[in-house]
Amino acid sequence: MLKLLLLTLPLLSSLVHAAPGPAMTREGIVGGQEAHGNKWPWQVSLRANDTYWMHFCGGSLIHPQWVLTAAHCVGPDVADPNKVRVQLRKQYLYYHDHLMTVSQIITHPDFYIVQDGADIALLKLTNPVNISDYVHPVPLPPASETFPSGTLCWVTGWGNIDNGVNLPPPFPLKEVQVPIIENHLCDLKYHKGLITGDNVHIVRDDMLCAGNEGHDSCQGDSGGPLVCKVEDTWLQAGVVSWGEGCAQPNRPGIYTRVTYYLDWIHHYVPKDF
């Protein structure tokens, strides 16, 4: 995915906001390991055609015909569904690909840049997938689920394994466990080293923080799922969105909070299938 490596903030009134650096998007798992077997059967790879159908973002199957991802993954450059393909759960990228076509791309109408939130989008597959033990939608959480601070969750993807370090062949799906960090504390962490006023919220209500030094998502993981186990059921808590660097001190990964957008999701995606 395209998780943002560095933060860009607008000027607000008379405040001068020192940004951590240029806006870049997230690409990979740092501090994790290969995800073996049929774990994470909802993970998908989004592909764009260059000299071949190349992975550019992650996503999650939330219905047999719908994929959830980040809006910054499918912005103006790839908004045409004919330019996107979806590969269902694969252990290794590009190994016996069976790419699925997309009939519709829907980005949230409030999305502009990731720092302003609403970094969420839906892709409708041309045809529904066949559900199995290896390919299965991830349940979405109830609106009441808060995912309290300290909850241990998992993020998955095929992105970079460190800042500027690409995932090497054979490009295995990676996983890493990350703790949820309460939004206020996460916001305080992001203010460290900046001259941004404390009254300016970097981490917004529709965002969720997770990760610690050495464990994080990175470039190429954008759009992928952050999942947490609640009473023996995996629920998708977040969508990989942005961050400053990968697994850096005081810079947790930032995810779009799924519960914030349940009404919008279900305006398009049936709850039952």
From Swiss-Prot:
Gene3D superfamilies: Trypsin-like serine proteases. One of its GO terms (cellular component) is extracellular space. GO terms for molecular function: peptidase activity; serine-type endopeptidase activity. The keyword Protease applies. Disulfide bonds join C57-C73, C153-C228, C186-C209, C218-C246. Residues 19-28 form a propeptide. It catalyses: Preferential cleavage: Arg-|-Xaa, Lys-|-Xaa, but with more restricted specificity than trypsin. Its EC number is 3.4.21.59. The active site is at H72, D119, S222. Residues 29-270 form the Peptidase S1 domain. One of its GO terms (biological process) is negative regulation of blood coagulation. PANTHER family: CHYMOTRYPSIN-LIKE PROTEASE CTRL-1-RELATED, TRANSMEMBRANE PROTEASE SERINE. Tryptase is the major neutral protease present in mast cells and is secreted upon the coupled activation-degranulation response of this cell type. May play a role in innate immunity. This is Tryptase. It comes from Mus musculus (Mouse). The gene is Tpsab1.
